[in-house]
Amino acid sequence: MKKFLFWIFFVGFLCVGCENVQLSVENQSSDIKQLSSSYVGKKVSFACWNVQTFFDAKTDGTEYDEFKKSDSWNSGKYCKRLERLCEVMKSLNSDVIVLEEIESISVVQDISNYLVDGKWDKSKNWNYVCFARNKGTSIGCAVFSRYPVKKLLIHNLDIRVQKVKQPSCRPLMQVTINIDEKDLVLFVNHWKSKSGGEIETEIWRDWQEALLGERLVCDFSFSEKNAYVLCGDFNRSVEDFVCNFDRKPECTDANVALRAFGHEKSNFVCVYSPWFDFSTEKGSYFYNGNWERIDNIFSFGSLKISEFMVESDGKLVKEDGSPFKYSIYNGEGYSDHFPLVCNLLL
């Protein structure tokens, strides 16, 4: 069983809840679908961003090689990078911000301190933060929220049926946030990269998709009134999921089908991606001369997404329109991904 590190804290106050889950195939009796409703409720601004290998200046041994071997990486550059990250977060000003590729809880605490900057404003600060990373791995994910975080569950793969050994895979975070007496459930993802070959590694992203689908189905079967957001860096473009553009009755208002073992009527669960309806952007990630939509925000349950866009203006973008990737050698840039932003209607 994998060991994992997880934290939920309110300005230094620690309280945690967790669950380590092995993927299994079970029968569920619930009728799962994307709910359709004209109701427009509470508006919550939301952002999701892969901040590109955000390490501190302390060597722990799990850093990527370029950070361990580079003489140019130091505390001064780290502090400058912290300032830039916090400037972007303040500019986004989203109520909930999800960050991928954060090294540790120490980095999360540094971000929190830089965001406060000696000024306490309960209405503007992100007073609730949680973080998770598997022990011995390099990076994890963090959630910054202006609303109370009720619960954090951690789900890990433990696959032993493939002919090859399961590689290291990052955990799935399930974060429950209470917003005006209503629960918003986040499933935060950072799936297996394509390093080692896109085809060769696709099986592990398939398993991570199945884990996500199963956890979503399971939670929804107990709390059908909840609003769900599935977000993160999936290392799979949205067009490469099973897409349902016909909007069939069983997938009302949904356009993507996720594999989900345990669904009695089918082996998928229907979710909604705003990429196809709202955004005219080519993508959020630029690699080998091609735009990709591997960063995603999906909705499910009693939730609508509005005003979805890629934040690709200002300092985050290079002259050619691609993300201003961070370089440890000159200390310039931000990330090789653009942030995704939207409004959630609960």
Residue ranges and their predicted role:
Residues 4-13:
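Sec-dependent N-terminal signal peptides
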Residues 51-54, 102, 191, 233-234, ...:
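Active-site metal-binding loops of divalent metal-dependent hydrolases
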Residues 15-17:
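C-terminal motif of bacterial Sec signal peptides marking the signal peptidase cleavage site
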Residues 1-4, 233:
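Positively charged n-region of N-terminal signal peptides that target proteins for export
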